[in-house]
Amino acid sequence: MHFFPIQLLVLFFAEKIAFAENSDQTVSRVDSNRYSVAAEKKFLLYDVNFGEGFNLRRDVYMRVANTVRSLRDSGENYILVLPPWGRLHHWKRMEVALSWRLFFDLESLNRFIPVIEFEDFLDENRPIDQVIYLQHYAEGWGTEYVRKFEKRSCLPPAESHYKQVEEFKWKGWFYSYEDVYSRNFQCVSIQGDSGTLKDLLKHSNFSESTSIMVDRAETILHEHYGEVDYWKARRSMRYSNDLVDVADAFRKKYLDSDDKRDKTKLVDDWTKEKPRRTAIGGPYLGIHWRRRDFLYARRAQLPTIPGTAKILQDLCKKLDLQKIYLATDAPDQEVDELKALLNGELEVYRFTDTQKLNDGQIAIIDQYLCAHAAYFIGSYESTFTFRIQEDREIIGFPISTTFNRLCPDTEPTCEQPAKWKIVY
């Protein structure tokens, strides 16, 4: 056996690390069979403002996931802890502590960054070392946008969300878990993106903590919106196999649609996907018809119910389609009115099996079915619509069949949505 002076070993690994940084390899990805790079395992948790809905939270996941990717690329051995779903503003049933595996394929998520469920985190980590409560600067952005952060006094409503019950013991919502607490709590004013959050975690005294929870994670923006790493994170968010099976059975039974005929089959491993625009979709029109609170916030941008019926009739005639899949939050009486205005000329289908599935699972099935339609039309500035457009980009539809919106009666040729095309 040969022995080497410790100085040579240090130099050897320093050169390997330098090489990794210069060649787009990273310490986190060094082949553990060849090199021994000791990196302490760390956990990043996060939460989002209560008022944010399911689809905005999916977007925040991508921001935080790219923070973890960036941390790992810089040599930090971070694992992302997935925040349990529940108590969401738009959900009819106030369920809590729902795991991600009910909605998404965890194996697919782990192909982008390492993730674990909160329950699995609790099995070996309790309490949380540090809660960082993100907030905007009280004085605003100023005359220019500068990426920055600093510890500040807490602004409302931070202090109503977390209470110190004794030294090194802070209580908060923590996804409804009663027996979870944090040793430390700190408010941080931040102005920036995923990269700014990475700098906060890496280049401050927070770096000494092994488990950090970032609350109000929606405060940070995407560092590279619409670029390669954005789409890698998005492509990793495959839906759970159980939900896909339910949706596929529905589209085959009612919509004459399947992957082979529609040319919508995806490879099992998203990292092996190739650019394409060959998807045809099922012989039906997919529509996301946003109602309820949008009638107050976006009334000028929405068609009336008769206006919606006319749009659907005109589109189906133009596209030679007889079936419509309707994803909507509209009350039943509004759906009935819409169907009546279609005069039985078109078949309207909805997924309504609410007994076995929760609100979030039904939302995903709605999106999946709209994403597999030959043509899709959505609602103005709706994150639900955005997620469908992203799904269709991943599946590989022609752009003209995806980026379409319902126009108000007063502006039938309204401006159509921005075309955020997939990047590989």
UniProtKB/Swiss-Prot annotation:
Annotated site location: Essential for catalytic activity: D391
Annotated transmembrane regions: none
Catalytic activity: L-seryl-[protein] + GDP-beta-L-fucose = 3-O-(alpha-L-fucosyl)-L-seryl-[protein] + GDP + H(+); L-threonyl-[protein] + GDP-beta-L-fucose = 3-O-(alpha-L-fucosyl)-L-threonyl-[protein] + GDP + H(+)
Pathway connected to this protein: Protein modification; protein glycosylation
EC number in record: 2.4.1.221
Family membership: Belongs to the glycosyltransferase 68 family.
Protein name, UniProt field: GDP-fucose protein O-fucosyltransferase 2
